Amino acid sequence: MATPTPDDIANDVQERSNTALKRGLASRHMQMIAIGGAIGTGLFLASGATVANAGPGGALVAYAAIGLMVLLLMQSLGEMSAHQPVAGSFQTFATKFISPSFGFAMGWNYWFNWAVTVAADLVASGLVMAYWFPSVPSWIWAVGFLVIVVGLNALSARVYGEAEFWLAAIKVVIVIVFVLSGVFMIAGVMGENSPGLSNWTIGDAPFHNGFVGVIAVFMIAGFSFQGTELVGVAAGESENPRRDVPRSIRTVFWRIMFFYIGAIAVIGTLLPYTDPSLLSAADDSANNIAQSPFTLVFARMGIGAAAAVMNAVILTSILSAGNSGLYAASRMLHSMALKRQAPAIFARVTKGGVPAYAMAVTTVTAALGFRTQLVFNDAYIWLVNIVGISGIIMWLGIAVSHIRFRRAYLLQGYRLEDLPYRSPFFPAGPIIAFVMCLVVMAGQNYEAVLHGQVWEVASSYIGLPLFGVVWWGYHVARKDRVVPLAEMDVAPVEIEPVTH
């Protein structure tokens, strides 16, 4: 092999400086990114639908089960991310530990998921603002929302992290106040007369619709927890990922579980599952902010401006989701470009370490998705359904990647004691999570399957064959193979020191 010349070395250094992200996320940023990613409109609006569909007991069981699954998956992701803290996170792991074609499909699947999610956030921003300004066209608010999100992402990872820290903090405070106030209401200390536990015994509560009801809630609960993987994506820009990733995995999950389980318990105890407002709150309408279970409970406390307060909180949730969505999508595209799984231009970064071209194409895609909703609503619904199942595919990939990583790590002579963080549940953890992911995926729209509603089934599961086509297409084009255990790159990734 020829010895590199000084010019070769200089060119390599220049190329790395043009494509290298900067580690600017502190420990507090990492923890709030994970929390903020998991607490959003799914909790503030859709949580009521889970109680309506499964009863208070069924909703609690569903969220606890999905929470367990996510815990196992985050343990797996934490082990790999602390060992190899790269921006591509699980997509890089899928490429290294499964096959390049699977990683390729997983990366583009994840990027498209967040690009369309940002588009959905643009739609939601217009709906929320219509609560206060019904006569103003929704596209005006969407443009303003997009400008804010792009501005927060365009400066640096640290600015993004700081914005997400405070946006997530608002949501955390509201949920804590909600849960504690709910406990006081149940105890009869404040608000109207306490219903006690009567709402757990009306009708066929606590398990309305039985096992079928729990399965129906699995998908809602699963979507609610999506976003916790952002801590893995952000590992590539963490100041100290070997410390902060495990810390975030260990502490953040239990906080998220407290928020969800606590909120669902309060909603199911204070509001009967037969209340029609619980279902209508999940519909896409500005008027239904007043039907949010959070709004209903706050109103019972005597807070007259409950709807306006929750509207403001939901707006911050949408901004937080859009902020994180643009961040995650642009980092994923940047990571794939470094592996030549996306056009090389997307690997370029600004002096602040921001992948500007990757961010730009994500922004344009989100804007087009928003435009599609305005003109072709049916097409937009299909887009949303395509990405709806992508989170489950991502989780499946994490489980398989971890199993193969651990096997290769030991086969190649490495010691478990040298891992910065070790999942305490291996090998049962990723196996159980894998099976649960399959159950959640199968139950995505079981009613349509049972009733033979072909169009609904196709709309719900279209993401699966599309993922398969991308996976197989890359496999055929590149003639790749499943990476043998002995050839896997499981060596620890060197971390350059952070300078301020």
Indicate where each model-derived feature is located:
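Helix-loop-helix junctions that connect adjacent transmembrane segments
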Residues: 12-22, 60, 137, 169-311
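Extracellular loop-to-transmembrane helix junctions
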Residues: 21-22, 46-141, 145, 151, ...
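TM-loop-TM module centered on a large, flexible mid-protein loop between adjacent transmembrane helices
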Residues: 92, 99, 131, 217, ...
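Membrane-helix boundary/coupling elements in multi-pass transport proteins
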Residues: 86, 109-124, 220, 225-238, ...
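Membrane-interface "cap" regions at the ends of multi-pass membrane proteins
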Residues: 1-48, 52-57, 70-75, 87, ...
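C-terminal membrane-solvent junction of multi-pass transporters and transport-like membrane proteins
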Residues: 166-167, 346-356, 395-455
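A generic transmembrane alpha-helix motif of multi-pass inner-membrane proteins
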Residues: 185-186, 381-394, 423-500
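Membrane-interface loop-to-helix entry segments
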Residues: 126, 139-197, 226, 249-253, ...
